[in-house]
Amino acid sequence: KLEDSTCDMLNNPLWDEILLISSKTEEDIKYGLDKICTIKKDVQSYSKITLPFIRAYIALKLKNDYVPLDKLNYKKTIDMVHKNDIVLSIGGDNYCYADVNKYIMLHNMMISRGAKTVLWGCSINPEVLSNPEIVNDVRQYQLITARESITYNALKKINPNTILVADPAFGLKTAYAEIPSKFINKNMVGINLSPMVQKEEKISGIIMKNYEILIEHILKETDMAIALIPHVIWDDSDDRIPLMQLYERYKKSGRVLVIEDQNCSKLK
């Protein structure tokens, strides 16, 4: 994951503390991130018997402006950020999603705290930059690291502090992952399939069919084993579901295995 490799890169005596503001703290702790950084929940409770809440509530009811109320959700956590702190936005492709306004709001809150902001390891569809609010937001970053040339070329025109750098995940240290002994010395190919990709298919079942053709080609034309490797394990998008379908179809070959969910260093 991007946050794992980033925290590992920043594990340096120069920094007093590395703080990860997370919407999924339990998941991050499960994968061991609490061992390399401090984890804080992004949204915190707040009192409704305050003037800021009353103002925010009025703005919602009279102007349909939900931003002031949203700010209250994040205020306690973002108040932990101080002047000249370096804040990395690590979502990668956050600006490509429907809730982009939330990230613009959070960025502005960080700037108001006096932080230096970095858009870290990002990918942005150039079409998204037709939105003037996004353009204005992107211009405010002190540094942008784009992880591929399409994003770099688009953002460089807007913010000169844009550089082209490989995704931080490529710098992630690898850890040994246990697999059945018969696979250890085999030449292997790793394959991932995501429900997120399947949801975008134009012809029902075409993605799975293409993966089946790929696996059958590998089994027929090579002596390679195949490792089915999950990447995203969310309630609404679990890679293990389509991967298990592939495994059940080809397990009798004796050359296919499913890698269980584990921390990203082992998956790598």
Feature names for model-found ranges:
Residues 1-268:
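Active-site anion-handling motifs in enzyme catalytic cores
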